[in-house]
Amino acid sequence: MFSLHTAASVSLYLSLAGSALAAVPAPAVTKAPTIVARALTTTLPASAGYTALPTARVITGSFDGKMVKYDRKGSSGACQEQTETGEADAVFILESGASISNVIIGKDQAEGIHCRGPCTVTNVWWEDVCEDAITIKQTGSGDVSTITGGGAFSAADKIVQHNGAGRVVIKDFFASTFGKLYRSCGNCSKSYQRSVTVDNVCLHGGSEGVGINTNFGDTATLTNIKTNGKPSSTNVCCTYNGVGSGSEPTKIGCGDKYSACKYTASAVGSC
């Protein structure tokens, strides 16, 4: 028998249920993220000032140069062409985990940047490379140093010299008139297995893209590579037999026919 008490209970239940449903918010609708194309600039930016450093500046955390030009003019760290120089002749020395960004490195310097451990280099430009633009000395097999954006001009030999272990990542980078964009050391006092990842770079007027030592177990992975024909699509990756200190490594050959060169020559574009 349906009583007034039952009717009241049903009414109260429906009222509470309706309130609970009304309290549930409508699902939020978010827009899909906008895909931003990564920039690759081929022009040396204008400097916002100039500083000549008497000695190498050591960076322990992060340093934003705000597009000021730095070099070692008038000091022992000034360019000595292809004379072998060292860390003391660098403009900047990055401690393990340090980062540097928005800097122009002028022509009056011998070594550019030395990374004692894993480092991050963002939007750094070399006006005129002397010996090497950047030297990587990390020692851990899992260490990674990343170079993003920026570019280098007039490197008679190497832009990135990888003397230590681990991996180097180079992306969104411009290189003009150079010997090699990257070289895994083929005759350092201590040999390591190394790898390099190169993505979205423009190579303009160079001899080789990357040079690796296959007998040390090195590998190179290259994507979105563009050149002006120099280096050729074959020479964007070259293999060597590394040796001990005091000897010279021997070149094996270049191109995607070598399994350590992980790229497709026919996919190399133009810039």
Spell out what each predicted region is:
Residues L12-G18, V103, E111, I159, ...:
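Generic hydrophobic/packing signal
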Residues A32-T55, S62, M67-E84, H114-C271:
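Extracellular beta-rich repeat passengers
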Residues T60-S76, G86-A90, L94-E111:
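LRR N-terminal entry segment and analogous cap-like coil->beta motifs
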